[in-house]
């Protein structure tokens, strides 16, 4: 399919969308939306509406970020008249809507004769009003940046297209809606867009909104390659899994993203962690990796090695089938078993046996496998599981001891209350 690339320069104040809504009955309207020029980031919706049947009595604007699943509706106060001009602001920064999110909006109008009219749905993509943005896009990918010339943007765009093609082949799926990457030049600019974010955060991904916001400075080719291949993996996988109620474990999501990076740095880390006994239990890799820098680094590397082993052992077709099974709402253990012939615990133990200082399979199952019923949080560990059992034993013992005391007390009370023989 031929893809049309559109290159556009966006001004500091964006006139992002607008159009005339043809009349349906007596009401007609023209709606626009723009990004205001001052921070915080705010969308400004405006409308001119007319009715030939009476006064416009009610106006309400509806808007939502595409992919959010939640539509916001806000009534607008105004003086009723046959022709009105309405406006409404929306603080996107306060509502944690990232730069690059695609916004859909329309207006609903009512006049005094009871006529109603919805304007056609329109879209705009607000970025950050502090910078002069450039965007290169087609139906699959949009790259927005301000630091660097057109050649730099073209390089990012081509790298992103290469990453998407690799992901589509690896997952056996096509991109169903455009994914967008927004590149800030440095940490200060990034922090200005996300003022409440921890200072150590260097990027944000919004898979449901199909947006990733990253720090990529002009000319940083190696970093740009790494970021695009990694971050686009999360966005594509989210599209693949749309409609499924089965969660993708963190080791599979992050492991696939790491696997897609052009250069792997994980093999040596994991061999060293295996030799020193610093590998993380499988339970740790199911959810959020936490905030401990050393553990997070091991978690990412371990996840990449797990995905690498899975692809090599189960094959490309089997790997794709795992995701297809999950799309059909098979949990990960069943999805692996159906596609590869083993559940997740057996898979993990098989991988573990390929590393130095490998424990016995039985030991690996005891220490590293999650409970069948639920995946522990990132903070969980086998030590905490063992301590929980010990606490349970103490609790049962205490109940038994208290029971003995209660029996003794009851026995004494009965003896004291027993009627004594009458005196003669």
Task: Please describe what each predicted stretch is.
Residues 21-133, 139, 424:
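Glycan-association/targeting regions that enable binding to alpha-glucans and other polysaccharides
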Residues 125-127, 167, 171, 410, ...:
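Polytopic transmembrane helical bundles with strong interfacial aromatic enrichment
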Residues 8-18:
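Bacterial N-terminal signal peptides
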Residues 132-249, 266-267, 288-289, 299, ...:
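Juxtacatalytic substrate-recognition/specificity segment
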Residues 383-403:
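Juxtamembrane/start-of-transmembrane alpha-helix segments at the extracytoplasmic/lumenal side
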Residues 398-424:
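C-terminal membrane-anchoring or membrane-association module
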Residues 199-211, 216, 222-227, 239-385:
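Acidic/His/Gly-enriched intrinsically disordered linker/tail segments
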Residues 1-8:
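Bacterial N-terminal signal peptides that target proteins for export
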């Amino acid at each position: 399919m031929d893809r049309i690339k559109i290159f556009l320069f966006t001004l500091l104040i964006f006139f992002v969308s607008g159009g005339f809504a043809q009349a349906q009955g007596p009401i007609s309207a023209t709606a626009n939306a723009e990004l205001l020029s001052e921070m915080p980031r705010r969308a400004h919706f405006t409308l001119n509406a007319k009715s030939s049947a009476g006064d416009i009595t009610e106006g309400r604007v509806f808007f939502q970020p595409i992919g959010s699943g939640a539509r916001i509706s806000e009534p607008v106060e105004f003086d009723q008249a046959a022709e009105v001009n309405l406006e409404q602001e929306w603080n996107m920064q306060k509502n944690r809507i990232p730069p690059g999110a695609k916004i859909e909006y329309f207006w609903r109008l009512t006049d005094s004769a009871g006529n109603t009219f919805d304007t056609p749905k329109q879209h705009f993509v607000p970025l950050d009003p502090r910078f002069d943005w450039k965007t290169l896009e087609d139906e699959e990918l949009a790259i927005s940046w301000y630091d660097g010339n057109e050649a730099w943007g073209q390089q990012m765009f081509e790298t992103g297209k290469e990453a998407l093609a690799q992901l589509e082949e690896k997952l056996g799926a096509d991109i169903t809606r455009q994914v967008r990457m927004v590149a800030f030049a440095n940490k200060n600019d990034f922090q200005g867009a996300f003022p409440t974010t921890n200072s150590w955060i260097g990027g944000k991904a919004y898979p449901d909104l199909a947006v990733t916001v990253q720090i990529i400075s002009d000319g940083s080719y190696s970093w740009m390659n790494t970021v695009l291949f990694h971050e686009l993996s999360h966005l594509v996988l989210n599209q693949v899994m749309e409609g499924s109620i089965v969660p993708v474990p963190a080791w599979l999501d992050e492991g696939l993203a790491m696997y897609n990076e052009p250069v792997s740095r994980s093999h040596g880390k994991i061999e060293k962690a295996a030799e020193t006994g610093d590998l993380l239990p499988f339970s740790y890799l199911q959810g959020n990796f936490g905030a401990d820098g050393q553990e997070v680094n091991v978690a990412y590397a371990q996840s990449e090695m797990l995905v690498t082993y899975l692809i090599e052992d189960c094959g490309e077709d089997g790997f794709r089938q795992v995701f297809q099974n999950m799309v059909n709402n098979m949990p990960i253990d069943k999805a692996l078993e159906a596609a590869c012939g083993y559940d997740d615990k057996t898979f993990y133990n098989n991988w573990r046996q390929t590393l130095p200082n490998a424990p016995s399979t039985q030991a690996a199952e005891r220490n590293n496998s999650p409970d069948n019923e639920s995946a522990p949080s990132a903070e969980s560990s086998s030590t905490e599981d063992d301590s929980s059992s010990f606490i349970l034993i103490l609790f049962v013992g205490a109940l038994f001891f208290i029971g003995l005391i209660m029996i003794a007390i009851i026995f004494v009370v009965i003896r004291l209350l027993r009627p004594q023989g009458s005196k003669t």
